[in-house]
Every structure is written in C-alpha cells, then in structure tokens.
Regions:
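Radical SAM/AdoMet-radical enzyme domain recognition
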Residues: 45, 51-69, 73-188
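Residue-level recognition of specific faces of alpha-helices
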Residues: 12, 17, 30, 66-68, ...
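Auxiliary Fe-S-binding modules of radical SAM enzymes
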Residues: 2-16, 180, 190-193, 197-330
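A short acidic, helix-capping loop that chelates divalent metal ions and anchors anionic groups
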Residues: 36-41, 126-133, 193-199, 279-280
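Short, flexible helix/strand-to-coil boundary loops that buttress conserved ligand/catalytic motifs
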Residues: 32, 107, 134, 272, ...
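Residue-level signature of catalytic and energy-coupling elements of molecular machines
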Residues: 20, 185, 266
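Canonical Radical SAM [4Fe-4S] cluster-binding loop centered on the CxxxCxxC motif
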Residues: 8-49, 62, 272
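Glycine-centered loop/turn positions within well-structured domains
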Residues: 26, 127-128, 252, 278
Length: 330
C-alpha cells in the first residue's frame, strides 16, 4: 500500500514533473538565462535506469498517478525512447512537454506506449517573431507536427508565454486555434526565473488578456477542477477546443497544488519557485533509501510560491533564489 505525500498544509501530491535533460534545441528568452549557458554533463544527469527507479518509488510507494516528462527539450535526449519504454511499464498516466520540432520522429513510439498527452509550446504564429522568441527559424516544423499530433488523435495542449510588447498582439489569433482545432490553448503569465530578464511591466495578467479576447468574443467559462492550473474558457458553443490562462503571477493556484518536480540532475523541488532542493540522486546512487527525504521535502513545502514572494508587485527578481527555467524543467 502506498503512502500519501501530504505537506504541512494538507495538500496531497499525486503529480510528478520529471525533467530528463537541461539541453534544448531552442533558446527561448523566458526560459534560458541571458548569459552563456552550458548543459549538464551526462554523469550529473539521471541515467535511464535511475529515472525509472526513482519514478517507480514515487508511483509505487507514494501514489504518484501522473508523470509529465519535461526538459529542457526531452526529445533531444539520445535515450528518450528507452526512457519512455521503461516509464510506460508503471501504472501511471504519462505525458510529454515539448517544443514540437522532433515530434514526427517519435509519434510511433508514443503511440506504441499508450502516451496520448502532449503539451507543445508555440509562442507565436509569425515566423519572424517565433525566431525572435526562440532564436530558431523552425515555426513550419513545429506547426506541421502540431497538425500531425491532432490528426493522430493525441490530446494536445498548446502553451504560449505572453509577454507585453513581444507577442501580446497575437492573443486573438492564438485563441482562435482553440475554436478551429480540438486543443486547449493555454496562455501563461511571464514568470521570474534566474537570468530571464523578468520585469513586472512585461507581465500580462489574466484580466487584461481576457479583456482583449472578450472585445471580440462572448467567451463561455468552463468548469475548473481543484488541481487545474489553467482557468478554462471557450470562444463559442461551436468551438472545437478551449483556451485557458495559467495565472501564476496574478492569481496563483497554490492552494490546490498537487505537484512535485524532479530536475534532470535528480534534485526534488517541492515548488517551481522554491529555493530548497532535495538531492534524491546522490542517496539513490549510494544505495540509500530516498523515501524519508521525499516525505520530508514535500512536508516542508511553503504555502505559496516557494515562500519567496506572494504578490507580483513585491517581486524583486534579483533577490529570488532559484535556477533558470531550463534547469528546473518546464
């Protein structure tokens, strides 16, 4: 029988965000630090066996029922197929977060292992702007793979980080994707991480984003479950999909948080913004039990945003102790 992972505020944790690499074939400005960046050496990363072994402890001992595989860009890892095949043997819902460029190489693998959940980043529908944000001229490949994902029957969520003065003028065109296709289009508020030049003035909160969309459409509010990170709407009754807002900065969902994060170098983070890290990999490699450290790490979770800030108005990014987004895992 598994033990529930409960923090000191009574929140039960059933969802593991599992980063398998901090390498990426994009250089997105909201994710990568401004300074020169080097990926971790392979010796510092969890091996495929270690990823499976630690994940198995989370699922079998602690009742984790959902694992989202992230990066970096998880599909650039040379043994991605091996990792997928091992994790697929666990009694857990599996999904993958990706920038989409390499998806066409792995559709068969994902289908063979019953993985249907895909989160794909697309921050712009304009080729030049896409290149400005990602530093890569690869929008056609991403778009083609999104369309193929939909046609193959994957459950697709599209993610766009909205930044004022960068891509906020594309809200309507991105929202229209949820009308035309059976997807969930998610608009993410720009969040502060090490080296990403976050400024309050670049954040477009939910009320402003929704106001822009509602000038053109009478949006329909949908039901949100307790653990949902996205506040969901439809443009109209005949929309094929829906859209939503991930409101980490303006209206946090910490009260219903059920997530734990494991970085590619085997550190558990109990919060995306948390400064504390719990080194599971070193213990695991030493043959030690990691269960007590997992329980302790979850119990010590702060009430809100890693204890580093509460309101967006009080954020000083220079004083936040954290990794860059790519080092945490998307």
């Amino acid at each position: 029988m598994s033990t529930n992972l409960i923090d000191s505020f009574g929140r039960k944790h059933t969802y593991l965000r599992l980063s398998i690499t901090d390498s990426c074939n994009f250089r997105c400005l909201y994710c990568m630090p401004d300074e020169p960046f080097s990926s971790s050496s392979s010796s510092k990363l969890m091996s495929s066996d270690e990823i499976f072994g630690i994940s198995k402890i989370f699922t079998e001992q602690f009742g984790i029922s959902k694992i989202r595989i992230t990066g970096g860009e998880p599909l650039v890892r040379h043994d991605f197929a091996e990792i997928i095949e091992k994790l697929a043997t666990l009694q857990v819902s599996l999904g993958v977060t990706t920038n989409g460029v390499l998806l066409d190489k792995y559709f068969s693998l994902l289908q063979q292992n019953q993985i249907q959940l895909l989160n794909i980043s697309i921050d712009s529908l304009d080729s030049e702007r896409f290149k400005q944000i990602t530093k890569r001229d690869l929008l056609p490949q991403v778009w083609d793979n999104i369309m193929q994902s939909i046609s193959l029957g994957f459950k697709v969520k599209l993610n766009a980080v909205i930044m004022k003065g960068v891509n906020d003028d594309e809200l309507l065109s991105l929202a229209m994707l949820s009308h035309n296709y059976p997807i969930e289009m998610r608009f993410i508020e720009f969040m502060p991480f090490y080296g990403n030049s976050w400024e309050k003035g670049k954040v477009m909160p939910i009320n402003e984003m929704l106001q822009v969309i509602e000038r053109e459409y009478s949006c329909i509010k949908l039901h949100d479950d307790k653990h949902d990170t996205s506040r969901k709407y439809k443009l109209s009754e005949d929309s094929k999909g829906c859209f939503g807002f991930i409101t980490t900065m303006s209206n946090a969902f910490c009260g219903g948080c059920n997530r734990i994060r494991l970085t590619s170098d085997g550190k558990m983070k109990n919060c995306l913004f948390g400064a504390e890290e719990f080194d599971l990999l070193s213990l695991y490699r030493a043959g030690e039990d990691i269960g007590n450290l997992i329980k302790e790490g979850v119990w010590r979770k702060h009430k809100e945003k890693g204890g580093q800030f509460t309101e967006m108005n009080t954020v000083d990014n220079s004083k936040i102790i954290n990794r860059s987004m790519i080092k945490i895992g998307g």
